[in-house]
Amino acid sequence: MAIERTFSIIKPNAVAKNVIGNIFARFEAAGFKIVGTKMLHLTVEQARGFYAEHDGKPFFDGLVEFMTSGPIVVSVLESENAVQRHRDLLGATNPANALAGTLRADYADSFTENGTHGSDSLESAQREIAYFFGEGEVCPRTR
């Protein structure tokens, strides 16, 4: 099976809980290589652009407000079947439905403040990685 890349966000509520290291450790324990990462504080324009597919939906403004409420950590993860394996590790989008031991079961506060984001397809991963990472900011791991 080919190595894939996926995109991950540790959202403001999880950053505020000081669990970045715990989440990274779980990524690595699950076999992911972290090949790009940075912390940033989204502007309203960045958040609206990233979540543009949800513009017009009832939750959009609240999502933008939440995602700009504090710093986030964006990362590029690499492994076989990365997109699906990462989504499995995150758990259900609604933390009320997330299985025990998933990141959302452990770190989410609500449906909107669900602690983490993960790409839902390879196409989304490519688009989302390009949104936050420029040329040379993702470093393939060779060891």
UniProtKB/Swiss-Prot annotation:
GO cellular component annotations of the record: cytoplasm
Organism expressing this protein natively: Citrobacter koseri (strain ATCC BAA-895 / CDC 4225-83 / SGSC4696)
InterPro entries: NDK-like_dom, NDK-like_dom_sf, Nucleoside_diP_kinase, Nucleoside_diP_kinase_AS
Keyword hit for ATP-binding: yes
Disulphides: none
Superkingdom of the source species: Bacteria
GO biological process: CTP biosynthetic process; GTP biosynthetic process; UTP biosynthetic process
Cited function: Major role in the synthesis of nucleoside triphosphates other than ATP. The ATP gamma phosphate is transferred to the NDP beta phosphate via a ping-pong mechanism, using a phosphorylated active-site intermediate.
Binding site for ATP: 11, 59, 87, 93, 104, 114
Quaternary organization: Homotetramer.
Protein name per Swiss-Prot or TrEMBL: Nucleoside diphosphate kinase
Alphabetized UniProt keyword annotations: ATP-binding, Cytoplasm, Kinase, Magnesium, Metal-binding, Nucleotide metabolism, Nucleotide-binding, Phosphoprotein, Transferase
Family: Belongs to the NDK family.
Catalytic activity: a 2'-deoxyribonucleoside 5'-diphosphate + ATP = a 2'-deoxyribonucleoside 5'-triphosphate + ADP; a ribonucleoside 5'-diphosphate + ATP = a ribonucleoside 5'-triphosphate + ADP
Pfam families: NDK (PF00334)
Cofactor section: Mg(2+)
EC number annotated for this UniProt entry: 2.7.4.6
SUPFAM superfamilies: Nucleoside diphosphate kinase, NDK
Name of the gene: ndk
Enzyme class: transferase
